[in-house]
């Protein structure tokens, strides 16, 4: 199908084959109708996808190296991020990234309402300083914060690779790969499934 995003879309992942089978069975046992808006697993299939850019595309896809995320968070100079910097610096690997992502998406809303604005202020100050290493990331955080105030996905964006595709370039997203399309037009080539797990930017 053709994807045309003129604004950031939801932060999402598609389940693996095993997760799809187990999730579908679990929701069937719970009696959740296939058409229900709270249903996650509408079939038993996994859903890897390939996105081919028809125009330029900006996206977030997959966890960036933990060390780079630590550098980014330190560059924003936000004291409220210090505990999370320490968490990831102490476990600078895929498990540490998943732990931090899980922490943020399960944060109570009152805590998000404090942390997200602090991060946005840090991004503004970073851009005003003239620093450029994380310019694209800081601008993305600001754009998402304006569009989705108080959303944990704004924080999660700091954990993901910021990608830019030119027409004809493509990105492959295996099942389980966390991603969000920000802007652009592309052709999605996917397995035959409607399973989407959304967690942020909604």
Predicted regions and their residues:
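Active-site region of the double-stranded beta-helix
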Residues: 1-169, 179-202
């Amino acid at each position: 199908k053709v994807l045309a995003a003129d604004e950031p879309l939801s932060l999402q992942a598609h389940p693996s084959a095993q997760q799809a089978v187990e999730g579908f069975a679990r929701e069937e046992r719970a009696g959740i109708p296939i058409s229900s808006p709270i249903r996650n697993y509408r079939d038993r299939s996994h859903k890897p996808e390939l996105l081919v850019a028809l125009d330029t595309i900006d996206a977030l896809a997959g966890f960036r190296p933990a060390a780079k995320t630590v550098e980014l968070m330190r560059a924003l100079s936000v004291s409220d991020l210090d505990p999370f910097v320490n968490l990831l610096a102490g476990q600078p690997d895929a498990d540490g990234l998943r732990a931090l992502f899980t922490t943020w998406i399960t944060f109570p809303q009152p805590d998000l309402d404090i942390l997200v604005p602090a991060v946005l202020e840090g991004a503004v100050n970073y851009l005003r300083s003239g620093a450029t290493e994380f310019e694209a990331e800081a601008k993305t955080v600001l754009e998402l914060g304006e569009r989705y105030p108080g959303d944990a996905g704004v924080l999660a964006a700091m954990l993901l690779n910021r990608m830019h595709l030119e027409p004809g370039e493509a990105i492959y997203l295996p099942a389980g790969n966390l991603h969000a399309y920000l802007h652009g037009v592309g052709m999605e080539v996917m397995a035959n499934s409607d399973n989407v797990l959304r967690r942020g930017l909604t």
